[in-house]
Amino acid sequence: MKKILIAIVLMAMAVTTVRAAHGAPNYPLPQNPDTLRILGVGNSFTDDGMMYLPYLLQAAGIKNVVLGRLYIGGCTLERQVKEYENNNPAYVYTKSVNNKWTTVSKNATMLDGLLDEKWDILVVQQASGVSGKYESYQPWLDRLIEILRFNCRNAGATIAWQQTWAYSTDSNHPEYPNYEQNQLVMYKDIMECNEQLLDDTPIDVVIPTGTAIQNLRTAMQDARDFTRDGYHLNYKMGRYTAACTWFQALIASVFRTTIEGNASRLKGSSQALTDAEALACHLAARRACARRFKVWK
């Protein structure tokens, strides 16, 4: 019994030491709140991930989620920190209330969006071109976490991470040579960085969009690997899969539901999905949330 007690004490001390090394703690996702508020702070990949979330929420009968997007195209973690420190009105701030996006400001500061609501979840990410290069993450990620934690009106907010996805095989993105112009090399490097940041920061909630897109590419063929330009997701199955992943990783966990069976097909738009296409996206997202850093085969 004494040995067991000693082991428990040592484990508790180890956990405390790890948390101390991370600085400010993270907090778990809320459970069944009256209103859930999610803010994405990032770039155009944040847009790709969040754009179709209102459709999925509406189809699920969930009307008590407020969404916000603060983005600058191509914005790195380093630039996020510097834009905050200089209080630059460089962000586009859009918001969804009652499951409909509206543009709040095209000249917002980070604080304009951050202070607008008592956000429950704050989602960050690295710019795609350097998302597989961990030397680009620090010290900027630690500083950004401090900024968000210090300024958020909800002291118990969860800070989460969105994985970026690898480029299409034929992408002409100027930073693709950093990954040998190879999609699988880029995906592997991104996943290694994601696992490293879990060790180095208090973040433990990951939206595995990169793995979901890679799952979809493994299951189905597409001329540009579900991108519209070699790196941004296409407006049909690409963005839909990303939104499904956000839903499964965040919404489903908070409200104890699932993306499986969601009836949204983007009907009435040029991006309407067939049942088979939607189910493939659901499956790619669900598999990614079950296995975040490895393609499901």
Segments predicted by a language model, with ranges:
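Alpha-helical cap/lid subdomain in secreted, periplasmic
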Residues: N107-Y235, Q248
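Acidic/histidine-rich, surface-exposed loop or edge segments in extracytoplasmic proteins
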Residues: P30-G40, D120-G129, E175, R265-L266
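Conserved SGNH/GDSL esterase-like catalytic core that processes O-acyl groups on lipids
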Residues: D47-Q138
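Soluble non-cytosolic domains of exported or imported proteins
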Residues: N32, L36, S44-D48, E135-P139, ...
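Sec-dependent N-terminal signal peptides
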Residues: I4-M13
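Conserved catalytic region of serine esterases and O-acyltransferases that act on ester linkages
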Residues: F226, G230-K297
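C-terminal segment of classical bacterial N-terminal signal peptides
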Residues: M13-R19
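N-terminal module-boundary/linker segments of secreted carbohydrate-active enzymes
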Residues: A21-A59, C281
